[in-house]
Amino acid sequence: MAFPTTEILSALIEPLAASHKFDLEGLKVTKAGPKSAVAIKVDSDSRPDLDQLEVFSQEIGELFDAAEQRGELNFGAGYTLEVSTPGVDNPLTLPRHWRRNRGRLVALDQDGRKRVARIGALNDAETHVVLIERNKKLLEVTTLELAHSPRAVVEIEFAKPAQDETALAESTFDEATA
């Protein structure tokens, strides 16, 4: 039996991730003999902490071991298991990514033009998101259709955001766009 593929491992991991209320955000399998690795990225609306990731990692290890004993998986000479969250440099590609980063700054790269905005609420259908941009002293509110979203990555912010921006980011989609 060959080293397991991402498809096979995803089918095993996803039910366990769901039981922890995690979304499987990434899975990378690197086959390199005794230095093989399985890197798993999970996230949730409540942001997993280190203790939760440790428990999840142990359960995945047990799941893989049991599947190997049954002959369903073969990791060969062994592997390293890495479990983490995606991190801030992960592009925002799904509505849940935007929802989880509400209130944070996002860098949007559209047609070679970069703009920075604060993420507001999503509409009920999760097809559009509010973006808040500061133009001198005024706040400008626009909406972005997620289906046509440019590359978007959370910006690290060291200063506390202005109160008016925070309040607008916390308002509902309808309130912000009224």
From Swiss-Prot:
GO terms for biological process: ribosomal small subunit assembly; translation. One of its GO terms (cellular component) is cytosol. The keyword tRNA processing does not apply. It is found in: Cytoplasm. Keywords: Cytoplasm, Ribosome biogenesis. PANTHER family: RIBOSOME MATURATION FACTOR RIMP (PTHR33867:SF1). This is Ribosome maturation factor RimP. The gene is rimP.
